[in-house]
Amino acid sequence: MSTLGHQYDNSLVSNAFGFLRLPMNFQPYDSDADWVITGVPFDMATSGRAGGRHGPAAIRQVSTNLAWEHHRFPWSFDMRERLNVVDCGDLVYAFGDAREMSEKLQAHAEKLLSAGKRMLSFGGDHFVTLPLLRAHAKHFGKMALVHFDAHTDTYANGCEFDHGTMFYTAPKEGLIDPHHSVQIGIRTEFDKDNGFTVLDACQVNDRGVDDILAQVKQIVGDMPVYLTFDIDCLDPAFAPGTGTPVIGGLTSDRAIKLVRGLKDLNIVGMDVVEVAPAYDQSEITALAAATLALEMLYIQAAKKGE
């Protein structure tokens, strides 16, 4: 099953260069990479404004503004000297075929994980996390979820492809343990009986960062963790370019501090999703997503250097 653009076309819209100008590698399974970046240009499961399929391209494009800083502030080292990170381009599927996307993404992830790689993925709408969870659970077993979002995405509407149902489906499939999972920044209606710990945006904005992180670590424990960041967790002042913006969200400063504070968790997979550049202003949403993705890589590099 071919999943990457190099099978027939190296000129993918987002792949003139890799994230942070990192090397492009269209054969990541056989590489010596520690982490592999994959774009998933898919937005058929969105319930709001479409356009998330252009998110991976926007994140890569703006990431050139971050590539010059070797020792990213306030870190004391260059992530690229500790982690071997490559960008393998975008998943290729028949646009309009959600099932094919899901199957190919899961197959791609399973192949990478079996080869000893870890994944950082760029959406695309948030549905792409579900096939990624399926692949990661096959490799790591049941996981904890650390989920930044304005929505819990635990809605049971019966639709197979919906970016609001993944975390209703995932516990039922045994992919994640909601009792060891936490959802951060929520500010929309949700079912309080689904087992997840919800730290809504009001308390996240009002409580101290260290206090929140201590609670997250207590909930997650030593389980393998999948980290997913929906950019609409941020307030629209910091991330207007997304499909379902909700006011009252996190600042970019608070989000970065929280992500940095997850360094000690056993994070086995990560994604940043729901960037829709058609609604962005001066690329601030894409820049926020690229910066958060870079911080995710830095927390992995920090652990490797210990």
UniProtKB/Swiss-Prot annotation:
Pfam families: Arginase. One of its GO terms (biological process) is spermidine biosynthetic process. It catalyses: agmatine + H2O = urea + putrescine. The keyword Hydrolase applies. GO terms for molecular function: agmatinase activity; manganese ion binding. Its cofactor is Mn(2+). Its EC number is 3.5.3.11. The keyword Magnesium does not apply. Gene3D superfamilies: Ureohydrolase domain. It comes from the Bacteria. InterPro entries: Agmatinase (IPR023694), Agmatinase-rel (IPR005925), Ureohydrolase (IPR006035), Ureohydrolase_dom_sf (IPR023696), Ureohydrolase_Mn_BS (IPR020855). Keywords: Hydrolase, Manganese, Metal-binding, Polyamine biosynthesis, Putrescine biosynthesis, Spermidine biosynthesis. Mn(2+) binds at H126, D149, H151, D153, D230, D232. Pathway: Amine and polyamine biosynthesis; putrescine biosynthesis via agmatine pathway; putrescine from agmatine: step 1/1. HAMAP family: SpeB (MF_01418). Catalyzes the formation of putrescine from agmatine. Belongs to the arginase family. Agmatinase subfamily. This is Agmatinase. It comes from Salmonella dublin (strain CT_02021853). The lineage of its organism: Bacteria, Pseudomonadati, Pseudomonadota, Gammaproteobacteria, Enterobacterales. The gene is speB.
